[in-house]
Amino acid sequence: MVVMPPQNSVNESEGRYLQDGFWQHGRFYGSWKPGKYLFPIDSEELNRLDIFHKVFLLARDNKPFLAPIRRTSPRIMDIGTGTGIWAINVAEECLSDAQIMAVDLNQIQPALIPPGFMPKQYDIEEPSWGPLLADCDLIHMRMLLGSIQTDLWPQVYHNAFEHLAPGIGFLEHIEVDWIPRCDDDERPANSAFVKWAELFLDGMDRFNRRVRVTPQEHRQMLEATGFTDIRQEVIKAYVCPWSADRNEREIARWFNIGLSHSLEAMSLKPLIEKLGFEAEEVRELCERAKRETCVLRYHTYCNIHVWTARKPGPQQ
């Protein structure tokens, strides 16, 4: 492992840059609060995050959010913003008069940002979100499983609740369930993708940063926090564009690209550091899984889960 000195931050194209960090397992990781975010922050990873933004847009009728916004000049937070692409999309194309705070451990957002976009480096596992934007109309979170300690999810939901405007503030939370599913048994008996998912989930469990999606548990946590009008939606994302449905094929094309970028990035640390794999063993498994997900006769899919909830007003 080589620690990068401050003067040697890795420059990126498109106005992005990487903060001081370190190379490990052949990838570049952030050095602010190391060990909290287990995935790389190099250019390949930034591309992966942007690809999944496209996946989620396609899966939701090209709408970056569905919650109603009832105030002019709304206040919005994007928790775990990554590259900031969701927040920038909202600022440029949906709500040009909004204040949008884009929160992440790593400052990997572009240098050129729209008015109203406020990047904020912050650890959302902190007990209080005091420095963050309050009285929000919308708090958006996605792909945070694996970035939050398993036992801290009630605290994260509580802090989101506290930072929403009573009566009109909404939370939207999106996650991918990485367990491969198939409704017609059209997948190989000894699936490399299934094996990858089992090992990845196990390794992340051992980090106490679970990525397993438990829909009812999340609903119960939202209810216990005090949210109302809770809605759950499940969207199929096929890993290969075999479907006769045009929209399903388009989602699958982008999901396949995103998945191809995800396999190695997400599983290097859990498989090497918790399950004892060598880096080349991980890459070989990922390559087999990648080839499998490109076979049209295999009808495997992953579920995308969406939770939407509202903070009630004082009289509700």
UniProtKB/Swiss-Prot annotation:
It is found in: Nucleus. Methyltransferase that performs automethylation. No other methyl-accepting substrate has been identified yet. Component of the velvet transcription factor complex that acts as a global regulator for secondary metabolite gene expression. Controls the expression of the bikaverin, fumonisins, fusaric acid, and fusarins gene clusters; as well as two clusters for which the corresponding secondary metabolite is unknown. This is Secondary metabolism regulator LAE1. Disulfide bonds: none annotated. Its EC number is 2.1.1.-. GO terms for biological process: methylation; sporulation resulting in formation of a cellular spore. Disruption phenotype: Impairs production of bikaverin, fumonisins, fusaric acid, and fusarins. Belongs to the methyltransferase superfamily. LaeA methyltransferase family. One of its GO terms (cellular component) is nucleus. Component of the heterotrimeric velvet complex composed of LAE1, VE1 and VELB; VE1 acting as a bridging protein between LAE1 and VELB. GO terms for molecular function: methyltransferase activity. It catalyses: L-methionyl-[protein] + S-adenosyl-L-methionine = S-methyl-L-methionyl-[protein] + S-adenosyl-L-homocysteine. Signal peptide: none annotated. Keywords: Methyltransferase, Nucleus, S-adenosyl-L-methionine, Sporulation, Transcription, Transcription regulation, Transferase. It comes from Gibberella moniliformis (strain M3125 / FGSC 7600) (Maize ear and stalk rot fungus). It holds the Pfam family Methyltransf_23.
